[in-house]
């Protein structure tokens, strides 16, 4: 997947919102979910389309992603975004995630479960 600087920044900003306090593997996993959605054909066909799809990632709809993107995401989130864009997937193909405490079956990484 070819990605512009803006795509990397936007993905990194989402990662920071959703997993900024998680370990690096947890940050990468959030990026992998976006890329898995992009490749699936069941979601919008651009990184921004996936991130801003209505009802999917609350921080995007609430303006937090745009704010972090404008101010520059932290370096670990940028690195995770770049690695996810490079097709690195530590979730087993997951297209969704939620809090691990939800009890949902899936791959648990940090405080999230990916499915």
Feature-to-residue mapping (PLM):
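Bacterial extracytoplasmic/cell-wall-associated proteins, especially those involved in peptidoglycan
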Residues: 2-115
